[in-house]
Amino acid sequence: MRVIFSGGGTGGHIYPIMALIERLKERKLVTNDEILFVGTDRGLESKIVPAAGVPFKTLKIKGFDRKHPLKNFETIELFIKATKEAKQIIKNFKPDVVVGTGGYVSGAIVYEAAKMHVPTIIHESNSVVGLANKFLAHYVDKICYTFDDAAKQFSEKKKLVKTGNPRSQQVLGLNKENIDIAKKWDLNPNMPTVLIFGGSRGALAINQIVEKSLSELETKPYQVIWATGQLYYGDVKKKLAGKEVNSNIKIVPYIDNMPGLLPQMTCVVARSGATSLAEFTALGVPVILIPSPNVTHNHQMKNALDMEKAGAALVIAENDLNPNNFVSSIDHILLDTNYAKKMSEASKKLGVPDASDQVISVMESLIKNK
């Protein structure tokens, strides 16, 4: 099987592809020479993909500027040029199937593949369908999705296949070596513990609310692992210099083995990006979600509300955050074991433990019938 993958800009477009590639290799359906990732040289993919040793090519492309419409003439020019380059990439690589996960770069490569009658799939991991996937839906053979709300936004109902997010299956496979929290941070593995984090870089609003709530959290009969993000760690340590933080609170810059920590957490406080939610639901971890307001179409809030509706999360809008609702939400989960158990069960129902295999089945079916 020869496959071109394309997605760019954010982790939500990249990690599902990386999970699929890993599973394809595990099942010996591809060699490294039979896959190609097409992205941009500016997005997160330009670091993640080459670092994983995956063959990588770039197209120069950018998104539409909603505030300055006149700048979009350049965007259209770049898109036309990118489709010509995409055509050449497809001709040279000769893929059996092309899979896009969103981002403008996937628009060019998947659109061109569809025109060339190469089997095509898009995968939508959010509740709100992105512009690239909305555009591509008319041309592709199959549309894989995670959230039911996303399915409602596609008019091409016959193309829809609910597969879940491939990251779900990957994170279950990675869940082999748990972090020894007693050894690493001198914490009690039998005590309720909450992990608070805002992604690898961190989230200022989440860090600020933890700072404001710290004195109250220190009095609680549970433990707190506060991952500030690499960007904010120095500032947080500086602000707390000279203050003796209680031993039930551990402040770290980043968690480098999230799948090894999540199964041990009673609760997690986090943003609601698609990749994070795939991890939480795969493992059935109760969550308090503080959606980022700085994302297109406010899709993190929609993702979070879908989780809350299913009973798998509590949601606090960033603008509504205060020490009272923040700490009481954590208390509600950590101090009520029945409630935490119900949330965990609801979360697991949303997870798709074989999501990668489901997407691969769609790929194989298209190749077989082409």
Swiss-Prot record:
Key word Protein biosynthesis present: no
Reactions this protein catalyses: Mur2Ac(oyl-L-Ala-gamma-D-Glu-L-Lys-D-Ala-D-Ala)-di-trans,octa-cis-undecaprenyl diphosphate + UDP-N-acetyl-alpha-D-glucosamine = beta-D-GlcNAc-(1->4)-Mur2Ac(oyl-L-Ala-gamma-D-Glu-L-Lys-D-Ala-D-Ala)-di-trans,octa-cis-undecaprenyl diphosphate + UDP + H(+)
Pathway(s) served: Cell wall biogenesis; peptidoglycan biosynthesis
A UniProt-annotated Pfam family: Glyco_tran_28_C
Record membrane topology: Peripheral membrane protein
Location in or out of the cell: Cell membrane
BP-aspect Gene Ontology terms: carbohydrate metabolic process; cell division; cell wall organization; lipid glycosylation; peptidoglycan biosynthetic process; regulation of cell shape
Main location: membrane
Listed InterPro entries: GlcNAc_MurG, Glyco_trans_28_C, GlycoTrans_28_N
Known EC number: 2.4.1.227
Chain residues that bind UDP-N-acetyl-alpha-D-glucosamine: T10, G11, G12, N126, S200, I255, Q300
Keywords: Cell cycle, Cell division, Cell membrane, Cell shape, Cell wall biogenesis/degradation, Glycosyltransferase, Membrane, Peptidoglycan synthesis, Transferase
Role played: Cell wall formation. Catalyzes the transfer of a GlcNAc subunit on undecaprenyl-pyrophosphoryl-MurNAc-pentapeptide (lipid intermediate I) to form undecaprenyl-pyrophosphoryl-MurNAc-(pentapeptide)GlcNAc (lipid intermediate II).
Family named by the database record: Belongs to the glycosyltransferase 28 family. MurG subfamily.
Protein name per the record: UDP-N-acetylglucosamine--N-acetylmuramyl-(pentapeptide) pyrophosphoryl-undecaprenol N-acetylglucosamine transferase
Organism: Lactobacillus johnsonii (strain CNCM I-12250 / La1 / NCC 533)
